[in-house]
Amino acid sequence: MRKNRLIIPALLTFLSMQGYAQELNDSITSGKPAKYSDEVVEIGYHKAQRLEESTSSISTVYNEDFNKRSAKNIANSLFGYGTGLTTLQGSGRYADAEPTFFIRGLQSLSTNNPLILVDGIERDITDVTPEEVETVTILKDAAAVAIYGHKGINGVVNITTKRGIYNTREIKFTYDHGFGWQARKPKFVDSYSYANAMNEALVNDGLTTRYTQDELNAFRSGQYPYLYANVDWLGETYRDMDATNIYNISFRGGASKFRYYAMANLTTNKGFIANPYMNDGYSTQDQYSRANLRTNLDIDLTEKTKLKLNVLGILSETRTPGADDQGGANLWDMIYTLPSAAFPARLENGTWGGSATWAGTKNPLAVSQAAAYTKFHERTLFADMTLTQDLSSITPGLGASGMLSYDNYAQYWENHSKTFVYGSNSVTAWENGVPSSTTYYTDGKESAMSSDAKCIAFTRVFNFA
């Protein structure tokens, strides 16, 4: 029997490929960040640990990392930094941009806010600018926060500010100009869609429709804007962009037994109010301004006796349009409540729009321009002193330290109130699809601006340790 054989020729070759890698450094060979492998971090109470030797869960963020973005305070700079740290922003208004922190999620039923320390003292993180901070250390597990007891149950955020450097001198000036956008603006229906939906809802409830077909046609055509309005209250009241300016100058250095760090910061923001300069002599813009002045001193009294002094002063002012009892007007609440078909923003004669039907909701555009403004002033002083004595002559590793701190906080309120005339025209009869008779409604009165001011909060706190 004849057998067939299949012969398959094969050619074996070797393919050589070259790969290019980045320059080798200590980070690649050792598996640790080269720059920070010998870093010592403060975990509180003058206790420090080397990162490479620590078994605690600690994450450290450095100034050169978080200070790459324009931010109101150090809290806003920590978005996306620090493993285990969750940062939530609750407001788009610059003055209220104070995020909430969680470390490793929610820890308890009562409170979930971590303990915030600034140079070892419990203080508000929003009072500190990014420029004056050296490091932010996040303590996450039980081993890391053990020295804080019950207060550290939700984790600890320890902020260390900059200090001077022996035998050096440095002057630094920075300027940031930033823009903010309303990224998630709500969309509201036009007046014709609103009127149709209102009629449908009334019919479903077995009631008479509110708008006639002639009125629906008027809303759709836009032929009578002062009688049947179609107002974009959001677009009329707010603009799309705000502007921020941050000026910072710092002085850093020292001699053989003395170190210093001094910083002055000025932050200003003009918000989203569309036309705030409609009045003589004042603006109704949503504005925020703050000045931070910090001085950190380190003095070597003797070879074993060290004195540390920190002083931070803050002046801030917040302006909001409209006047209310210790607060500005809630324009967003008005915009959400008022439909586009309610009344025109302004009448043909220049009077602000308003109606008896919507008497409970004011014209947000009128409030943002013609109802004056409210101001909040905050005055804050933080001062602390730490004296450290090395007692290693008695026994190696022995030392003693004492700390004294003083916090002073005051808040002042100014209410500048002003009223205005408002009104609207209503159609009472139609003829061949055209309004044939109208009535005029008016209310309110034009008043001069009145002012009231008082101190609404004053706090002084002393700490000894």
How would you describe each model-predicted region?
Residues 17, 28-31, 257, 351, ...:
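Compositionally biased regions
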Residues 20-39, 46-100, 104-115, 121-126, ...:
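Membrane-proximal, glycine/serine-rich, low-complexity loop/turn segments characteristic
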Residues 265-290, 320-322, 378-382, 393-465:
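Small-side-chain secondary-structure face that scaffolds active or pore-lining regions
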Residues 1-33:
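Cleavable N-terminal targeting peptides that direct proteins into the secretory/outer-membrane pathway or into
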Residues 130:
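Entry/capping segment at the start of metal-dependent catalytic domains
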